[in-house]
């Protein structure tokens, strides 16, 4: 995993109800990313539950996702249990 390779940390942002990973790429590490500090936002079961609750609270007609197929299969269990 990219975050582990660069000794990053994963935290859950309570304001956005989403996890994020923060990691730094140094010049001495090989890879496609240029040197710098990166913040990577993603979804997990906890963040999906929060978003589903929000959609239900406001009676929204559905949910959307970007780039289906990159998620962990367990994510769908969370979606189906909560909709």
Curated annotation (Swiss-Prot):
SUPFAM superfamilies: (Trans)glycosidases. It comes from the Bacteria. Residues 1-83 form the GH18 domain. GO terms for biological process: carbohydrate metabolic process. InterPro entries: Glyco_hydro18_cat (IPR001223), Glycoside_hydrolase_SF (IPR017853). Belongs to the glycosyl hydrolase 18 family. This is Probably inactive glycosylase YkzR. It comes from Bacillus subtilis (strain 168). The lineage of its organism: Bacteria, Bacillati, Bacillota, Bacilli, Bacillales.
